[in-house]
Amino acid sequence: MFPQCKFSREFLHPRYWLTWFGLGVLWLWVQLPYPVLCFLGTRIGAMARPFLKRRESIARKNLELCFPQHSAEEREKMIAENFRSLGMALVETGMAWFWPDSRVRKWFDVEGLDNLKRAQMQNRGVMVVGVHFMSLELGGRVMGLCQPMMATYRPHNNQLMEWVQTRGRMRSNKAMIGRNNLRGIVGALKKGEAVWFAPDQDYGRKGSSFAPFFAVENVATTNGTYVLSRLSGAAMLTVTMVRKADYSGYRLFITPEMEGYPTDENQAAAYMNKIIEKEIMRAPEQYLWIHRRFKTRPVGESSLYI
């Protein structure tokens, strides 16, 4: 039912040699002390910005739409921090995949673990709602060290990278489930598993409702959360990990179980967006603003991106 983490001799083919080289460099890189990794990661992110003009433009537009009350200067400062965080994301991916448990444990603390344990004591599944922070990959590893669970994901097009990322993610978790595998997700929840997923991206018009998100009135929001809730009867809570502002490590936040989740899919979409907004505001400069969150528009409306 779920992807298996099995090595294939095919991965030794020359077409994968460049990927192996990149992975080797990343492995060597993350052997450095964490403060050095932070210094290098933030610098690489800043230096990459001039080469990622399209992504910079997307981030600027997203911030203009979501935070019109902020000055242009404030938003530009957030963009600069966002690109530094993007560089850290590469470092944190290597940390998540290659660091031993003992080293990971030195760099995080947890707030609200009892909330997850209480939800699991109800003998039903738990829908663990996440958001796309730059430290997402490491956050999954950290969450698994606190409480192993399952997670939904999009399979990688490169089969070697698929093996590496699945192997890395399963170092502290139970299984990965393809995000389109509705039967697998619902089945796991009905068996009492905790399953992580992130409903904060634009997945297109099909299966979405338009609901407010920050200052944008109509934002395509997946109905997947609503469908999973109705089919599984699972509890819902959020798990978010942010990088501490002084780069002294990370904090994992686990909120209490959500209450009053709507029975109407449009209201449910608006409800979930409010939850996601609150999580993003823990560290907005670390959120994935380079994603075209507002790509899908209501029929008849023009694109918000030029």
Swiss-Prot record:
<keyword id="KW-0997">Cell inner membrane</keyword>
<keyword id="KW-0346">Stress response</keyword>
<dbReference type="GO" id="GO:0016020">
    <property type="term" value="C:membrane"/>
</dbReference>
<dbReference type="InterPro" id="IPR011920">
    <property type="entry name" value="Lipid_A_LpxL_LpxP"/>
</dbReference>
<keyword id="KW-0812">Transmembrane</keyword>
<dbReference type="GO" id="GO:0008951">
    <property type="term" value="F:palmitoleoyl [acyl-carrier-protein]-dependent acyltransferase activity"/>
</dbReference>
<protein>
    <recommendedName>
        <fullName>Lipid A biosynthesis palmitoleoyltransferase</fullName>
        <ecNumber>2.3.1.242</ecNumber>
    </recommendedName>
</protein>
<dbReference type="GO" id="GO:0009409">
    <property type="term" value="P:response to cold"/>
</dbReference>
<dbReference type="GO" id="GO:0009245">
    <property type="term" value="P:lipid A biosynthetic process"/>
</dbReference>
<feature type="short sequence motif" description="HXXXXD motif">
    <location>
        <begin position="132"/>
        <end position="137"/>
    </location>
</feature>
<dbReference type="InterPro" id="IPR030857">
    <property type="entry name" value="Lipid_A_LpxP"/>
</dbReference>
<dbReference type="GO" id="GO:0009103">
    <property type="term" value="P:lipopolysaccharide biosynthetic process"/>
</dbReference>
<keyword id="KW-0012">Acyltransferase</keyword>
<dbReference type="GO" id="GO:0036104">
    <property type="term" value="P:Kdo2-lipid A biosynthetic process"/>
</dbReference>
<keyword id="KW-0472">Membrane</keyword>
<dbReference type="Pfam" id="PF03279">
    <property type="entry name" value="Lip_A_acyltrans"/>
</dbReference>
<comment type="similarity">
    <text>Belongs to the LpxL/LpxM/LpxP family. LpxP subfamily.</text>
</comment>
<dbReference type="InterPro" id="IPR004960">
    <property type="entry name" value="LipA_acyltrans"/>
</dbReference>
<keyword id="KW-0808">Transferase</keyword>
<comment type="function">
    <text>Catalyzes the transfer of palmitoleate from palmitoleoyl-[acyl-carrier-protein] (ACP) to Kdo(2)-lipid IV(A) to form Kdo(2)-(palmitoleoyl)-lipid IV(A). Required for the biosynthesis of a distinct molecular species of lipid A, which is present only in cells grown at low temperatures. It may confer a selective advantage to cells growing at lower temperatures by making the outer membrane a more effective barrier to harmful chemicals.</text>
</comment>
<feature type="transmembrane region" description="Helical">
    <location>
        <begin position="20"/>
        <end position="40"/>
    </location>
</feature>
<keyword id="KW-0448">Lipopolysaccharide biosynthesis</keyword>
<dbReference type="GO" id="GO:0005886">
    <property type="term" value="C:plasma membrane"/>
</dbReference>
<keyword id="KW-1003">Cell membrane</keyword>
<comment type="pathway">
    <text>Bacterial outer membrane biogenesis; lipopolysaccharide biosynthesis.</text>
</comment>
<keyword id="KW-1133">Transmembrane helix</keyword>
<dbReference type="GO" id="GO:0016746">
    <property type="term" value="F:acyltransferase activity"/>
</dbReference>
